[in-house]
Amino acid sequence: MKHHLLLFSLLLIMLVPASAQKAGVNIFSYNVHNCIGMDKEQDYQRIAKVIQQADPDIVALQELDSVTERNKGVYALGELEKHTGMHGIYAAAIPFQGGSYGIGMLSKEAPIKYEVIPMPGREEKRALIIAEFKDYVFCATHQSLTAEDQLLSVPLILKALEGIHKPIFLAGDMNSKPQSKPQEMLGKQFTTLNDTAVYTFPADLPNRCIDYIYAYSQNGYQFDVQQQKVIEEAVASDHRPVQVVVQIKGK
């Protein structure tokens, strides 16, 4: 009888779908170029469709207008919230044409809390969003084009993460190649989760990786990358989006 019960239990385990097992965090990073594609068309629904098809839990977004003149007063993140059904966080980096220009975040789960931290940028100021969720903290940014500013940003990011005891992810357009000094500096504190040999920019004929997803490696958590890809979307924006599914392991 016990033998039959054991076999029955094993059969049930085998029949449980993978989705019912402990799922990884599906992370997405996308420089959306204010939803203007390589065809010069601005299309919020097209960008939203790219995001929806990937079905991410959390998204870092770069290059968003908020009620600017060139955007005809439209709040770009609001359009993406509407079309994806996700929660949005916007961070203005600079005032621009009667509104602002900055970065954003979309999430299936409403954040517990978040903060926006200014980041250096001599060509234009930058920003970092740090949002806390139930099981992790997610950070989104868009770094300066200047290597000196990128290097200055690293200690500011690390300072902002002090005292956080949950697993931490960071994602965004970092404007630096994998072998650069800023990436070397980040690599001492973070593990890069995406495959940097797969290029992300420009979208039509990519020849470099400048978009990244990282896990913070200094507060004891381990991470198992279950999936990593660059979405082969060549038109919707001037960057291709990066996607990683990662399982958080205990300390």
Regions found by a protein language model. Give the residues of each.
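Active-site beta-strand/loop signature of hydrolases that rely on acidic residues for catalysis
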Residues: 26-32, 47-71, 138-141, 157-184, ...
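Active-site-proximal beta-strand/loop segments in catalytic clefts of secreted hydrolases
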Residues: 30-33, 62-64, 91-94, 107-109, ...
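Structured beta-strand-rich core segments of catalytic domains in phosphoester-bond hydrolases
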Residues: 24, 39-40, 64-136, 226-233
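Sec-exported extracytoplasmic/periplasmic mature domains
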Residues: 52-56, 81-85, 89, 111, ...
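Extracytoplasmic/secreted envelope proteins and their assembly/folding machinery
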Residues: 44, 48, 74-77, 81, ...
